[in-house]
UniProtKB/Swiss-Prot annotation:
The gene is nuoH. NDH-1 is composed of 13 different subunits. Subunits NuoA, H, J, K, L, M, N constitute the membrane sector of the complex. This is NADH-quinone oxidoreductase subunit H. The lineage of its organism: Bacteria, Pseudomonadati, Pseudomonadota, Gammaproteobacteria, Enterobacterales. It is a multi-pass membrane protein. Disulfide bonds: none annotated. Keywords: Cell inner membrane, Cell membrane, Membrane, NAD, Quinone, Translocase, Transmembrane, Transmembrane helix, Ubiquinone. It comes from the Bacteria. The keyword Transmembrane helix applies. It catalyses: a quinone + NADH + 5 H(+)(in) = a quinol + NAD(+) + 4 H(+)(out). NDH-1 shuttles electrons from NADH, via FMN and iron-sulfur (Fe-S) centers, to quinones in the respiratory chain. The immediate electron acceptor for the enzyme in this species is believed to be ubiquinone. Couples the redox reaction to proton translocation (for every two electrons transferred, four hydrogen ions are translocated across the cytoplasmic membrane), and thus conserves the redox energy in a proton gradient. This subunit may bind ubiquinone. It comes from Escherichia fergusonii (strain ATCC 35469 / DSM 13698 / CCUG 18766 / IAM 14443 / JCM 21226 / LMG 7866 / NBRC 102419 / NCTC 12128 / CDC 0568-73). Belongs to the complex I subunit 1 family. The chain crosses the membrane at residues 11-31, 81-101, 114-134, 154-174, 186-206, 237-257, 265-285, 304-324.
Length: 325
């Protein structure tokens, strides 16, 4: 087929890799919601979803059908355009954040030299979705939830970014593939242990997951910024939250635990196993920790996480300068 030039083949392969990887991410996010409900039932000594299909295996299909057929209701005095745009931005930004994660050698949607900066930019874009949802709903609980979420996310993104600077300094690159290759002998979690701890805490907070789910606190805010959403608009917020968990888990693996590297098994299998482990940690955290007050969450971030990241960065810089002499 002479019309298939090498450039066209390269473009088609890139599109194929992007479609496969992003479909897998969406599927993992959807199945994590089912697995979380089953595991929470086990932890709380009750049954999880077990009626639809064998052992509840078709619960996701039932939920999807329900979402499609629920009324797509928009509040009377809301800003209809922004109200509709918010869940799309939330879903798309969190999905695109995964594009810079290499799942195995050569399998990455966008192998950018500024990969970490791209991730931070997408994480910052998700804040706009929350603000748009809260403001456009014309609901006081939505607005309060959006204000909480934006303040919490912007604060913890500072710690998230600073915790990555030590990894960048050690690898000498913002490229995710270069960072994975730099861990061929020692995983970054050993020299960057405090950076990993801060990144994990900030990652949970940025995803608005328990115990940092104050923006969605049912007892105080009646489900927060997406209280007025229903149908597939709510579904986009819901799936987007789990895609964020998959992305943060994959970044923990890539930045601190050697990415796809491991003995005996294929690289993709190692990456999937490590990522699944951290996804499980999100569920265990939700099952075991109480929700603190909002002021305690913000105080913890600025008084503990920020000094910890700065100390980690200063020590890393000092060690690199000492080794260069």
């Amino acid at each position: 087929m002479s019309w298939l030039s090498p450039e066209l083949i390269e473009i088609l392969l890139t599109i194929l890799k992007a479609v496969v990887i992003l479909l897998v991410v969406v599927t993992c996010g959807a199945f994590m919601s089912f697995g979380e409900r089953r595991l929470l039932g086990l932890f709380q000594n009750r049954y999880g979803p077990n009626r639809v299909g064998w052992g509840g295996s078709l619960q996701l299909v039932a939920d999807m059908i329900k979402m499609f057929f629920k009324e797509d209701w928009i509040p009377k005095f809301s800003d209809r355009v922004i109200f509709t745009l918010a869940p799309m931005i939330a879903f798309t930004s969190l999905l695109l954040a995964f594009a810079i994660v290499p799942v195995s050698p050569g399998w990455v949607v966008a192998d950018l030299n500024i990969g970490i900066l791209f991730f931070l930019m997408m994480a910052g874009l998700a804040v706009y979705a929350v603000l748009f949802a809260g403001w456009s709903s014309n609901n006081k609980y939505s607005l309060l939830g959006a204000m909480r979420a934006s303040a919490q996310t912007l604060s913890y993104e500072v710690f998230l970014g600073l915790s990555l600077m030590g990894v960048v300094a050690q690898a000498g690159s913002f490229n995710m593939t270069d960072i994975v290759n730099s861990q061929a002998h020692v995983w970054n979690v050993i020299p960057q242990f405090f950076g990993f701890i801060t990144f994990a805490i900030a990652g949970v907070a940025v995803c608005h997951r328990h115990p940092f789910d104050q923006p969605e606190a049912e007892q105080e805010l009646a489900d927060g910024y997406h209280i007025e959403y229903s149908g597939m608009k709510f579904g986009l917020f819901f799936v987007g939250e789990y895609i964020g968990i998959v992305t943060i888990s994959a970044l923990m693996v890539t930045l601190f635990f050697g990415g796809w590297q491991g003995p005996f098994l294929p690289p993709f299998i190692w990456f999937a196993l490590k990522t699944a482990f951290f996804m499980m940690m999100f569920i265990l955290i939700r099952a075991s920790l109480p929700r603190p007050r909002y002021d305690q969450v913000m105080s913890f971030g600025w008084k503990i996480c920020l000094p910890l990241t700065l100390i980690n960065l200063l020590v890393t810089a000092a060690v690199i300068l000492w080794q260069a002499q």
